[in-house]
Structure formats: structure tokens, C-alpha cells
Amino acid sequence: MNGVEGNNELSLANTTTPSHASEDLDLKQDQGLQEETDTVREMEAAGEAGADGGASPDSEHCGPELCFRVAENSCAAAARGLEDAPSPSKGGDAPSAPVAADDSSKNGCQLEGPHSPAKPKALEACGAVGLGSQQMPGPKKTKEMTTTKCAISVATGKEGEAGAAMQEKKGLQKEKKVAGGGKEETRPRAPKINCMDSLEAIDQELSNVNAQADRAFLQLERKFGRMRRLHMQRRSFIIQNIPGFWVTAFRNHPQLSPMISGQDEDMMRYMINLEVEELKQPRVGCKFKFIFQSNPYFRNEGLVKEYERRSSGRVVSLSTPIRWHRGQEPQAHIHRNREGNTIPSFFNWFSDHSLLEFDRIAEIIKGELWSNPLQYYLMGDGPRRGVRVPPRQPVESPRSFRFQSG
């Protein structure tokens, strides 16, 4: 045994209490241990009941720490009792040292000197005895574990609250989107600017195409107009050498025949040519020109009937005055049809500009007779020739012209 241990034993022997003090200390320690044991058992029973009944995890984890504190308090009380006991005399109290040592060993506390480094070990041993057969970690580890578990529990609770807040926020955003979508659906949408630009571009393209078509039509009209004039000139030259060609064509036309009297037929036998000319800019209209040989009825070699469209849109008719020989005027001869009704002379068409029937004469001559005179000339000789040419349908011109005298 070294010197330090000897000194410790000596000091322990010197601090032992007398026999009656030792008995009182033992009684107090027994009562304290009994109370602490009962408290630990109640806490254990409460922990088991909490585990069975769904107690919180925090209370279950904190139970061992409380038990350790109870045991630590009992050892501390024992140590204080030894320190507070009156110091005995050096002489007669030495034999009671073993008794105190035995009592201390019963309580599981090996007490040493007040400044001895073995005091924490004694407290640790007392904690082990207080907890019974359970071997718990040291106080620091137990506190760290308890603090960690409590922190995890608090963090878990905070995460749950944060998740609930996020879910509620998402729900509010969805409701706002749904409400906003309903408002957008009910609101009428204005046409996009891009669509209007596209429509304007298409309209401009159509205008360009129409302008190109007009220019192309004018070019084709001039081209084929020249070709037609060449054929018309050749046709007119041939017709002039056929006696009574035009009077026969007029008489064979179903609509013009009722308008021609016997005297009109005699005057039209001197007719050698018919020309129809369309007027261009700046004058718009149509001109009819009848060419006659010398005859006993009038002095004119040509009679002209002209229709012109004015800037106001009204169509007016103009004609050449007929210079009649004396006593050959149409008014001097009264013509009646089979029903006894008076028939106006065909040549009144050149002088009278008020009758709508005369406007109809201009349309028939331009659209049917002049375009295909051979068809009507051959209508009377059809059975003899064995050929009947179907009437040619007039082609509608883009610049439609309707005759109306005024």
C-alpha cells in the first residue's frame, strides 16, 4: 500500500461517526432509498402505462435520466450526512470505522476522502445501484441522447407544420388559377393583330392579282380584236357581193321580222353592209352603221345609230337625220299588221329615241344578227341546203352594256 492510500484510510477513519450517529444515518439512508425506490417504480409503471396507452416518446426517453438523478441524489445525501456528522475523538472512535465502512458498502457507495479523485466513481456506482439491474450510459451520454431525440421530435413537428402550410398554399394557388381561368373564358377575346395583318396582306395580294388580270384581259382584247377585225373585213367584202343578204337575214330573224313592213323591206334591199363598233375610252358605248346604195327613198349613203354612256351612268342615243326624198317619209305610209294594229316603221328607230322597243332592236342586232348573220340568212334555205346552224349564244362581256335611249 502506498502513502496516498494510507492517508486516505486514515482520513476516512478519522471522519467516522459514533455508533448512535451511525444508526441514525443508516435509518435515514434506508428511508431515503425506500422512497427513491418507490419513486422509480412508480415512474417505471407510469412509463409502461404510457407506452401501452400511447404516451409521448419524449417522456419515455426521459425516464432513465430521472432515475439516474434520483440515485445520484441519494448518494449525495449520504455524502452530506457523513460530512455533517460530528468528528469523534481520536481515541475511542477508531473501532467504529469498519461499521461505517460496512454501511457505506451496503448502500453501494465507496466513500473516500473529500478531495479524492474516486468520488465520481462512487457517484457512478450509486447511479448503477439506483437503476437496479439496468445498465444505463453515463449522465452525459444520456443527456445527449435525450436532447437529440427531443430535437428530432421538434424538427419533425416543424417539418409537418411546414408541409401542411405548403399544401395549403398550393391549394390556394390552384383555386386562384381556376378562378382566373373561368374569368378568362367568359371574357371575349379581341382579334389578334397578326390576324388583321394577314387579312390585309391577302387583300393586297388579291388586288394585285385583279390588276394583273385586267391588264392581261386588255392585252388579249387588243390582240384578238385585231384578229377579229381582219376577219370582219373579209366577211363584209364577201357579203357586199351577195344581193339582198341583209334584208333576208332581217326577215328571217323571229324577233325583227314583225318590225319590218313591206315598205321597210323595199328600202332595206339597197342595204349592202352592216357594221357594229364598240366605243372605247373616253367614250363608252356602241355604234351601228348601215351602208346603202343609191335608192329612191333617201339621200344618205350611211345611217348611223349610236349609244353612249355618260359620266352620270345614263345611256343616251344619237342618230344621223335621214334626208328623205319628197313623199317617201314613213309617216306618209300607214302600216298595219294582221290584227289591224298600226306598225311603226323600222326606220323610225333612227329618229325616235323614246321607245323601249327600239332599244331592244339594238340589243338583237349587236348580240345575234351581226355576230352570226350567215345563220339567219340560211334559215329560209335550211330545208333546201339540209344544214341548219344552231343560233350562237352571245358572250357576256365584262363591261356589260345595255341600250337605253334618252
From Swiss-Prot:
Biased composition (Basic and acidic residues): 167-188
Region of interest called Disordered, as start-end residue ranges on this chain: 1-63, 81-121, 161-189, 387-406
GO BP term, example: nucleosome assembly
Pfam families: NAP
Compositionally biased residues, Polar residues: 8-20
Listed Low complexity bias regions: 93-102
GO cellular component, as recorded: nucleus
Family designation: Belongs to the nucleosome assembly protein (NAP) family.
Protein's recorded name: Testis-specific Y-encoded-like protein 4
Lineage: Eukaryota, Metazoa, Chordata, Craniata, Vertebrata
